[in-house]
A protein has these predicted regions:
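Aromatic "clamp/platform" in nucleotide-sugar-dependent glycosyltransferases that forms part
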Residues: 258, 277
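Short hydrophobic beta-strand element within catalytic cores of glycosyltransferases
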Residues: 35-37, 294-297, 307
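N-terminal strand-loop element at the rim of the active site
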Residues: 5-65, 235
């Protein structure tokens, strides 16, 4: 099986990490995998030597030049599967396959069958209904949903049940174990022994950090030495910083921005908080649980498929700072319970959310789709 993977993002977020884990994992089980990535992107920078890498930067979803370049590569490489990992990737894959097959219905002079298009769906948003979106998603042979919550949304959008398959995302447990811990108290000059509540997410509206800051305002009234470290960058940085100032939390809430040592920072957290309004699955939750950290998270999207309430963490409604603050306070004041939840989270991730399981299930999707196509 030969799969060609497409991710057009320049930034590094959970989705790009999943792409890299998938591609490397497929190669480890003996499959051929190549990657189309943005030439200036963080994903391309992190690719290991030996991987077939094709730089491509579509300017728009219907970038004819990018589509033409990719169509020529399809004719030369003749992959069995094109796995598009983001919406722009779906568009360029659909365009390139259409250009490559033309009126012959094949991608090669010998009449090779055109590749199947697999589309990963990692966000719990509905598919857009404009004409371009309808066209590109009609070209998809199978959707891979990162959670059952996303799969249900795809079915609501009219995707046939046999063309939407859930494959929960996974993490590399060995990589997590190998990450050196970061002493957050020294790094960010936090008071000695101050409990640290951490969040890792882009500063964008649906991640809900504004509600986390509101919760922090309530938490420090009950736990005055508590500190909050929010890792990530995004369009809402100015808004969140202003909110911190309005609540007079400058000594309690820190926004260090994007860091490459995220796993080490998570190991320095006493508690992991996720404030998302919507969430496909939440791979940062998996990282935190793999680091044996108890969780306080919202019930958004696929999060309840990860966090076992009362066992690995506590779940609260989205957009509810009061409930989030109460859950954070409860766990900060219960060292034993917090430790037990962290241990249970580690066991849950080790059993259900490994990269090996994710790769095996992804390979099975490829085999099924390729084997059943006319």
């Amino acid at each position: 099986m030969f799969s060609l993977h497409i991710d057009t993002a320049r930034t590094w977020r959970g989705g790009q990490n999943q792409v890299l884990l998938t591609v490397n994992g497929l190669r480890e089980i003996g499959q051929r995998a190549a990657l189309v990535a943005h030439p200036d992107g963080e994903l391309r920078r992190r690719v290991a030597e030996g991987l077939e890498l094709i730089p491509l930067a579509p300017l728009t979803e219907m970038d004819l030049s990018a589509g033409w370049r990719l169509s020529r590569m399809l004719k030369r490489l003749q992959p069995d599967v094109i796995h598009a990992h983001d919406p722009h990737g779906v568009a360029v894959a659909a365009l390139a396959r259409s250009m490559a097959t033309g009126s012959t219905g094949s991608t090669g002079s010998a009449g090779a069958r055109p590749p199947a298009i697999i589309a990963s769906r990692r966000v719990d948003f509905h598919l857009k209904g404009n004409s371009l979106s309808r066209w590109k998603y009609r070209q998809v042979d199978c959707f891979v949903a990162a959670s059952e919550a996303i799969r249900r949304m795809l079915l609501q959008d009219g995707v046939p049940a046999d063309q939407a398959i859930t494959v929960h995302e996974g993490i590399d447990m060995a990589h997590v174990r190998a990450a050196p811990p970061v002493n957050l108290h020294e790094t960010f000059f936090l008071p000695h022994r101050a409990p640290v509540v951490g969040n890792v997410a882009a500063l964008v509206p649906h991640k809900g950090q504004r509600y986390l800051v509101d919760a922090a305002h309530l938490v420090v009234q009950a736990v005055p030495d508590a500190r909050f470290v929010i890792l990530g960058e995004g369009e809402l940085r100015d808004h969140v910083e202003r909110q911190v100032r309005e609540h007079h939390l400058e000594k309690h809430v820190f926004l260090p921005g994007f860091r490459t040592d995220v796993l080490g920072c998570i190991k320095g957290f006493d508690l992991f908080a996720m404030s998302s309004i919507t969430e496909g699955l939440g791979t940062s939750l998996l990282d935190a649980m793999a680091c044996s950290r108890a969780i306080v998270a919202t019930e958004a999207g696929g999060i309840p498929e990860v966090v076992d309430p009362g066992v690995t963490g506590l779940l609260v409604p989205p957009r509810d700072p009061q409930r989030m603050a109460e859950a954070i306070i409860a766990l900060l004041q219960d060292d034993t319970g917090r430790r037990q939840m962290g241990e249970a989270g580690f066991a849950r991730v080790s059993e259900r959310f490994t990269v090996e399981r994710m790769v095996a299930e992804t390979a099975a999707v490829y085999a099924r789709v390729v084997g059943t196509r006319p």
